[in-house]
């Protein structure tokens, strides 16, 4: 007799994001495509041997300060190793070594050090991250002469629902210096995120992909003990495969617009402007220009 039973496969579980990436889709709509008050150049190249070079330079139009960074990265895929060297115009040198999916699947260990020859200041950090279905854990240890600081986070996810906790324990003071909690829900085109930081800062964000070319985001924040509430709306529209326009406004009447155009493969230009709606005729508005080159 034929087997009439119908087998249903269990719904695949997704790996939740890290605590720092909760609400990232909404933040990206507010942050990407804008660069007010800066003239910026980013260059990314890759050698034949697989070494990646990233250079970034920017000039602040208000202060005239010029800053830059240089980063080289080499991935030894056979052993899951990544070596990164960093330098910036503050003359701070950084070295990072990471190993991923070698000790066990989903585990990443990172050793990060920085050194400033001008001041002699040194710092070291060991980072660990473990992610599997329904869970994303992180634990970092900052080494300091006064005593290490321990940063921990955990995010749990089930059928689109997310819950996370983040803490920092300062061993020198023997107390928690940070205690944050977040709850969220996400689907393919909708994300909701709420968070409480140290019991005093409350925030929330909504991300909605209205259609294939149009994304919107709403952000709300409030601090207890004050009457200050921060509210903002942002949107991004993809004009065509090579061009997009972004806009945002907040309750302080600050209006930002940005236009991004891919001039050719590997060359991207971004123009942005920030207008103060409360003092439109008084000036103080900001412009921004960014050029990204990748080869």
Curated annotation (Swiss-Prot):
Domain remark text: Consists mainly of a membrane-spanning beta-barrel formed by 19 beta-strands.
| Disulfides per UniProt | none
Output the PTM entry. Answer: Ubiquitinated by PRKN during mitophagy, leading to its degradation and enhancement of mitophagy. Deubiquitinated by USP30.
Q: Where is this cross-link: Glycyl lysine isopeptide (Lys-Gly) (interchain with G-Cter in ubiquitin)?
A: 32, 65, 73, 121-122, 125, 173, 278, 286
Give binding positions for NAD(+): 254-256, 272-276
Recorded hits in InterPro entries, A to Z, give: Porin_dom_sf (IPR023614), Porin_Euk (IPR001925), Porin_Euk/Tom40 (IPR027246)
Report the main location listed first in the record: mitochondrion
- Gene name in the database record: VDAC2
The subunit structure is: Monomer, homodimer and higher order oligomers; formation of higher order structures is necessary for scramblase activity. Interacts with ARMC12 in a TBC1D21-dependent manner. Interacts with KLC3. Interacts with SPATA33. Interacts with PPP3CC in a SPATA33-dependent manner.
Known function: Non-selective voltage-gated ion channel that mediates the transport of anions and cations through the mitochondrion outer membrane and plasma membrane. The channel adopts an open conformation at zero mV and a closed conformation at both positive and negative potentials. There are two populations of channels; the main that functions in a lower open-state conductance with lower ion selectivity, that switch, in a voltage-dependent manner, from the open to a low-conducting 'closed' state and the other that has a normal ion selectivity in the typical high conductance, 'open' state. Catalyzes the scrambling of phospholipids across the outer mitochondrial membrane; the mechanism is unrelated to channel activity and is capable of translocating both anionic and zwitterionic phospholipids.
Query: What is the native source organism of this protein?
Result: Mesocricetus auratus (Golden hamster)
The residues annotated as site (Involved in ceramide and phosphatidylcholine binding) are: 85
Q: Which domain of life is it from?
A: Eukaryota
Name it: Non-selective voltage-gated ion channel VDAC2
């Amino acid at each position: 007799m034929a087997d009439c039973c119908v087998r249903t496969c269990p719904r695949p579980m997704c790996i939740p994001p890290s605590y720092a990436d909760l609400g990232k889709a909404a933040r990206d709509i507010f942050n990407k495509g804008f660069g007010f008050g800066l003239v910026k150049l980013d260059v990314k190249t890759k050698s034949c041997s697989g070494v990646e070079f990233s250079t970034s330079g920017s000039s602040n139009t208000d202060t005239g300060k010029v800053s830059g960074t240089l980063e080289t990265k080499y991935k030894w895929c056979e052993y899951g190793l990544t070596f990164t060297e960093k330098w910036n115009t503050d003359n701070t040198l950084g070295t990072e070594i990471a190993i991923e999916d070698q000790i066990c699947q989903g585990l990443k260990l990172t050793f990060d050090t920085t050194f400033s020859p001008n001041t002699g200041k040194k710092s070291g950090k060991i980072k660990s991250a473990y992610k599997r279905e329904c869970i994303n854990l992180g634990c970092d240890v900052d080494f300091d002469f006064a005593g290490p600081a321990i940063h921990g986070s955990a995010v749990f996810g089930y059928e689109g629902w997310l819950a996370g906790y983040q803490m920092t324990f300062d061993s020198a003071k023997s107390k928690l210096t940070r205690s944050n909690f977040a709850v969220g829900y996400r689907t393919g085109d909708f994300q909701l995120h709420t968070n409480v930081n140290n019991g005093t800062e409350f925030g929330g964000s909504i991300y909605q992909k209205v259609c294939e070319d149009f994304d919107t985001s709403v952000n709300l924040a409030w601090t207890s003990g004050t009457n200050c509430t921060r509210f903002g709306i942002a949107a991004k529209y993809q004009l065509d495969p090579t061009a997009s326009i972004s806009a945002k406004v907040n309750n302080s009447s600050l209006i930002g617009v940005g236009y991004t155009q891919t001039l050719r493969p590997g060359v991207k230009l971004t123009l942005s402007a920030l207008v103060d709606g409360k003092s439109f005729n008084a000036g103080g508005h900001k412009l921004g220009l960014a050029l990204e080159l990748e080869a």
